[in-house]
């Protein structure tokens, strides 16, 4: 971060931390101005974004003969005009001249008149164009995907206009490992669309399949990743590029009731969902459910034409690469990848959810978190709830305090899908759903029927991924910590925690649930009783130790504790997780 002096104005300080990036891609040119200030660099907040929907890839091919040709002069002129406009915008924001990067990829690199194009940009703006080599382009693309999530582990696939890139990636604690031999193949969405018009599609399918059989060997997947994939039912596939984002938007369009339709970054689907759609597009050569009257959100006419080609490509790839269990979609591109590549390890290691929620944290948020964690069995709670959702919940605990009472839980439910952290880069749909569910419970969870349906849809987002039993536990404990915070924030509503007002004590109960056994004895046959009565539940008793006479624990607070008992009892009903809330009053 820049050094401050007494003469610095706020505008000068902000401007010094801004950087401009121009991403000259195959299917469009993206302009952005981002902040690289250390306190929020991990989530790369943008102050300006724009895009020129100009395909440098397509303009290099004759529409009649498919012969390659130079980038037309009028297109170069149009690009230079857009560049000059962005230069003025950078001046308006105060972006230092040395903090603007112009980065070009495949479409520029392979252009017949690449030098003419680059010189024209320099002549009109004074900006030099960095043309990434093939390996650098893959590396930056991987960084873009890694920046889009908290952790990434699995295979990496980028489908651009002219080519595709395959690699593997592991990111954890700020370190990024990837293949030293990534493979690029000429099967981009635009390339395949042209070939499908002239080539035999069956032959093309087998060509891609064989090429990817070789490619998967060349990238050298580490044995530990192969072993883990065997245990877990397959690899996660992390994707980027316009062709695959188009597939993601199509799958969202087809998923009736899916609650996060407008954010593609962080969306995940099962292998079965993705594979079925790929096969349909390949075999039918059309998009299901699409018409002139019903266009797919964020899928342009040009992208829609390419989707059958993407379907053919993915159908072939899936027959060549190891088993995939889930497909993850990323919006991280050259902007995000180039910024992330420059971040120090300690900033890369930060959790995007905690960085996004930190500006809203009460002064003593650590005390709230400490008190919350005294109500949690640390050894059994899912890691995502304890390490990510609980701290973010404490950060956001009072952000809706000024809202009308009846609006608070509803606004909280939407906090990461339409609310104050919805625009944060780096959040999966699962994380967005969980923090909304937790924060809604923190405000009591009293929401109208339509919002109750939305809440259930958010739960389904969580249940779609991974092991179903573990996902159910994650949802359960997320609701639990939100309900506990409802009481904590009722006792301490001012963002300040006084010592010795109340605390929690957790004890484990691992015995067979007697009440469940009795219910089955009354209502079912003897055989069923035997099977069910031996089932053990994870049982805990949480005692709220509270001062009898403290003003902060008056009738209104005691009423919250009664509500807590009811809500946790309801949560525990029919669940493997069982928590009983007890109350112990003491005199000071």
Curated annotation (Swiss-Prot):
Gene3D superfamilies: 3.30.420.40, Exopolyphosphatase. Domain 2 (3.30.420.150)
GO cellular component, one term: cytoplasm
Pfam families the UniProt entry points to: Ppx-GppA (PF02541), RTG2_C (PF23566)
GO molecular function, one term: phosphoprotein binding
Single Gene Ontology BP annotation: maintenance of DNA trinucleotide repeats
Stated role: Required for a novel path of interorganelle communication between mitochondria, peroxisomes and the nucleus, thereby maintaining a functional metabolic interaction between the tricarboxylic acid and glyoxylate cycles. In particular, required for the retrograde expression of the peroxisomal isoform of citrate synthase, CIT2.
Extra remark beyond the main annotation: Present with 3260 molecules/cell in log phase SD medium.
Family: Belongs to the GppA/Ppx family.
Protein's name according to its UniProt entry: Retrograde regulation protein 2
UniProt organism field: Saccharomyces cerevisiae (strain ATCC 204508 / S288c)
Lineage of source species: Eukaryota, Fungi, Dikarya, Ascomycota, Saccharomycotina
Gene field: RTG2
């Amino acid at each position: 971060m820049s050094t401050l002096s007494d003469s610095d104005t706020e505008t000068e300080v902000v401007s010094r931390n801004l950087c401009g990036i121009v991403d000259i891609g195959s299917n469009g040119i993206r302009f952005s101005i981002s902040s690289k200030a250390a306190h929020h660099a991990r989530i790369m907040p943008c102050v300006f974004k724009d895009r020129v929907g100009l395909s440098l890839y397509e303009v290099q091919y004759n529409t009649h003969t498919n012969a390659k040709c130079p980038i037309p002069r009028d297109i170069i002129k149009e690009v230079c005009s857009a560049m000059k406009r962005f230069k003025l915008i950078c001046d308006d924001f105060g972006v230092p001249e040395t903090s603007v990067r112009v980065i070009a990829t495949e479409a520029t690199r392979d252009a017949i008149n690449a030098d003419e194009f680059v010189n024209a940009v320099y002549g009109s703006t004074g900006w030099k164009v960095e043309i990434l080599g093939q390996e650098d382009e893959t590396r930056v693309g991987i960084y873009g995907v890694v920046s889009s999530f908290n952790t990434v582990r699995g295979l990496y696939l980028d489908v651009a206009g002219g080519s595709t890139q395959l690699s593997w990636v592991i990111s954890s604690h700020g370190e990024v490992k990837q293949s030293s031999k990534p493979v690029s193949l000429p099967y981009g969405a635009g390339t395949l669309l042209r070939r499908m018009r002239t080539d035999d599609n069956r032959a093309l399918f087998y060509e891609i399949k064989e090429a990817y059989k070789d490619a998967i060997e060349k990238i050298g997947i580490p044995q530990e990743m192969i072993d883990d994939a065997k245990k877990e039912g397959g690899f996660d596939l992390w994707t980027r590029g316009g062709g695959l984002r188009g597939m993601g938007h199509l799958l969202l369009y087809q998923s009736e009731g899916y609650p996060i339709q407008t954010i593609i970054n962080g969306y995940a689907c099962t292998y079965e969902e993705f594979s079925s759609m790929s096969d349909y597009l390949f075999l039918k050569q059309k998009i299901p459910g699409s018409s002139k009257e019903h266009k797919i959100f964020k899928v342009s006419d040009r992208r829609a034409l390419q989707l059958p080609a993407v379907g053919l490509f993915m159908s072939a790839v899936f027959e060549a690469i190891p088993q995939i269990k889930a497909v993850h979609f990323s919006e991280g591109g050259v902007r995000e990848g180039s910024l992330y590549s420059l971040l120090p390890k300690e900033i890369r290691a930060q959790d995007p959810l905690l960085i996004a929620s930190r500006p809203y944290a009460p002064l003593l948020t650590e005390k709230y978190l400490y008190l919350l964690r005294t109500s949690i069995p640390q050894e059994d709670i899912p890691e995502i709830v304890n390490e990510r959702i609980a701290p973010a919940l404490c950060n956001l605990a009072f952000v809706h305090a000024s809202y009308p009472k009846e609006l608070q839980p509803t606004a909280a439910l939407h906090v990461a899908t339409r609310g104050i952290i919805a625009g944060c880069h780096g959040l999966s749909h699962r994380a967005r759903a969980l923090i909304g569910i937790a924060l809604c419970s923190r405000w009591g969870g009293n929401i109208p029927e339509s919002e109750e349906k939305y809440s259930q849809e958010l739960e389904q987002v969580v249940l779609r991924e991974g092991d179903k039993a573990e996902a159910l536990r994650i949802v359960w404990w997320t609701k639990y910590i939100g309900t506990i915070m409802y009481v904590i924030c009722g006792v301490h509503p001012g963002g300040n925690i006084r010592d010795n007002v109340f605390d929690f004590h957790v004890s484990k109960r691992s015995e067979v649930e007697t009440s469940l056994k009795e219910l089955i004895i009354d209502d079912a046959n003897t055989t069923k009783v035997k099977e069910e009565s031996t089932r053990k539940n994870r049982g805990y008793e949480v005692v709220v130790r509270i001062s009898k006479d403290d003003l902060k624990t008056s009738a209104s607070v005691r009423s919250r504790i009664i509500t807590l008992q009811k809500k946790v009892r309801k949560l525990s009903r029919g669940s493997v997780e069982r928590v009983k809330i007890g109350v112990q009053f003491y005199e000071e």
